[in-house]
Amino acid sequence: MNTRIIPALLGALLFSGVAEAAPSIYPVDTARFLGGSRFDFKVEFDGELAEKDAKVLINGQDAKAVLDAKPEFIAKEKGADASALLLRGASLKPGQYKVTVESPTGKASANWDVYGTPDKPVAKNVILLIADGLSMGHRTSARLMSKGVTNGMYNGKLSMDTLPYTAMLGTCSVDSIAADSANTASAYMTGHKSSVNALGVYADRTPDSLDDPKQETIAELLRRTTGKSIGVVSDAEIEDATPASVVGHTRRRADKAEIVDMFYSVKPDVIIGGGSAYFLPQNVPGSKRKDNKNYVEMFQKEGYALATSNTELSKAVKGNPDKLLGLFHTGNMDGVLDRKFLKKGTVSKFPDQPDLTDSMRAALSVLSKNPEGFFLMLEAGLVDKYSHPLDWERAVYDTIMFDKVVAMAQEFCDKNPDTLLIVTGDHTHSISVIGTVDDNLPGELMRDKVGIYAEAGYPAYKDRNGDGYPDDVNVSKRLAVFIGNYPDYYETYRPKMDGPFVPSVKDEKGHYIANAAYKDVPGAQLRIGNLPRTESTGVHSIDDLVVGARGPHADAFRGFMNSTEVFRIMSEALALGNK
């Protein structure tokens, strides 16, 4: 080769690899959202410029005029050393829109599909039931443990198995193929995709987690355009990602004190869950607030009946309240395996926590009083909380509990056929049933006691009292369930009878290593993790979700769908478009 042309070739290659700086547009390209819903429009330029040099058009017209919102031009955005254009509270009529941005620092474009809804609603009520992290492995394990199998045939179905319409949901994020509960639940509540850890916003470049471009949630939309009641129920902290998605706007899901203020702003008629530590002023023992606001008292002054135990919840419901605040734990509540059977976790400290079925019953009692209807989001949050630390038995017992809530919802739908019921998770875990573990099989290693294929046979769970739960989780022949991603940990092949599983602990280098507390469990096997050593538990998988539905417009769930379609179907059923 002629060496004299090498510099020229290198120069050409380097030049071709340099991308032109491009502004960022929010809502993002490919966004599909509801006509008439509110959103913040933002353009982030890649350098400082004068407002007159920024050309922002929507379908060839000035964006400020099209969006009918007050613009704010930021000459130098904090932390960016670049300019931005921001319009808060914009809305659009249904149609196809193309946004084009040109400036001395670069150009960009985005296409939006803004959809409408029918003029008249087909549903009066919407019940959205979410088991956080619900995966096929949870469902299969719950059916095996709760119903059993005879000669290859299940002895019964889960209630969620009987929903007539099903689809697969994709949960990818704006910034990643992976997702967390914040932005997956937010997709259901806003119809917009978002970024990992974000709630009701497009994550922008500013350091402030609370100033990002907002997406109106279904609760805000209902408050603004209807007289319907709103309910939010969880057995996790009520400020946690999934329940927070009903009202929240933050780039950082950990802004839990601020999320309580967002609950207070929207004021759902029913708020039930854990997380009282963020409602109480900082001078109260156990509070996690950094101010003196007492949101318990503030909600009570707004007419909310208060319950802090299951006994108080029953009493409050008998009082026929119009609004209900139930806070039963300073943090996440305990799952059914600990509450009902083992009495571990924090049950001794919080002995009178309601079951999720109790919370569902209370919520329906209050919400169904409204002749204009209601929207209820209920989360079984601990399915995820236990799946992360590989504590699959606790996760599956809570899946069985969740299915009891589904059965209650179906009974409500039987009596109220104008109710759309949607049942799903918000993301998945890589959990699978691969056979059984039989303590009576020979072998020194527990792995040799794992039965696969024909050797699996059937587990020995019994449900003599007919409550749907195995009477004993620690039977001699039990399910072999494994999760496909994990930190270093000791696999014991047994349920954790002494309390929730803590698979790993941090060493002096800041890496997570297997928790030696399980090292001497007979037959325990050290498993070297397949995740980065910064991870203490398993993580979410990117597998598709299953969604089931019944009621008005449930037939819209079919095939594969993006998770944002859940919002669209709810909006269509309630005719919320362009109000």
Regions found by a protein language model. Give the residues of each.
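Aromatic/hydrophobic beta-strand junction motif of beta-rich domains
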Residues: 39-47
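Aromatic sugar-binding surface patches on proteins
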Residues: 71-86
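Edge beta-strands of extracellular beta-sandwich domains
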Residues: 107-116
